[in-house]
């Protein structure tokens, strides 16, 4: 076996002429049974004519039979873990001669695993202050706020105006129109043009004014345009927050008092922050693990990871309402820009797999079943049907792999040497 470069290897294989002839005769006989030639009964055409008439088909069938068989045999003999599809070249196939060919392929690299426990990483459990708890509860109260109509007066900062809008200029096609839109005057989220032009108006007042929208505005019809609107103030409201009392706590769930609610909120904040801090620490552990191990990675793995990263970016764009086809991107440059990160991610995956093998870390049947049951609840389908679907499309394997990776990361985190943040 010859090492070409990195993980790429090649094999030159020779198949004895006698075996090639035997296989050729078998294929000729098979073709002969099915061939229908003028002047001969089905299956009775002479072999010499069959060989001449179907030379191309016979050659292809012999190659498709012998090459994969002998290649697989040689790969197993040399204990090679091939990734991707081997490239077959330099095929030498002539009568009464050995069949020779060259196979070029990539293999999973041999990794000499160094130290992976006791890795130093900055980490400390997060703190949750009383102010954090109060802020989170205030957010909940904001979500439960009621907007109450109040007597007409000029709009001021902090008021909520109920406005009807219709575009007069600046929009192609049908005008933009809304019968009832609620805006908070003076709020950061409200366009300044609305604040300036609505401030001081009273219910029943009307006004025309222009609003300039940024190029990245969510609505394609308004993005990057200067639009003239006709606005009518239809009402005035104020926001009323619910009182922070035991009754409010009881409405939110299984809490009897405000103190119980505060304790539950404190625990929820701590859990979320702890998860985020641990994820950050785990990422740093993986970075150190990758930096400490130098080995080549299969290009087929890197290309696959680049595709995954690009597809994730495309999905993110679509979710934001952006059509990637209109961005005029050089996709080759986009892909190449992902290469370094993709290569590190492949290395990380291979190293974590090596650690999980060394420590016998695996996903259990119960853990996989729990994820399937969760998916079944979300999809409102029978568990058995979802399990069958996941088994057929390979999702079960991906779930098991994801669980194994999470458990391996937790193993590394638990055995890391944690230091206080500098």
Curated annotation (Swiss-Prot):
Involved in protein export. Acts as a chaperone by maintaining the newly synthesized protein in an open conformation. Functions as a peptidyl-prolyl cis-trans isomerase. It is found in: Cytoplasm. It holds the Pfam family Trigger_C. One of its GO terms (biological process) is chaperone-mediated protein folding. Disulfide bonds: none annotated. It catalyses: [protein]-peptidylproline (omega=180) = [protein]-peptidylproline (omega=0). The keyword Cell division applies. It comes from the Bacteria. Consists of 3 domains; the N-terminus binds the ribosome, the middle domain has PPIase activity, while the C-terminus has intrinsic chaperone activity on its own. GO terms for cellular component: cytoplasm. This is Trigger factor. Residues 158-242 form the PPIase FKBP-type domain. PANTHER family: TRIGGER FACTOR CHAPERONE AND PEPTIDYL-PROLYL CIS/TRANS ISOMERASE, TRIGGER FACTOR-LIKE PROTEIN TIG, CHLOROPLASTIC. Its EC number is 5.2.1.8. The lineage of its organism: Bacteria, Pseudomonadati, Acidobacteriota, Terriglobia, Bryobacterales.
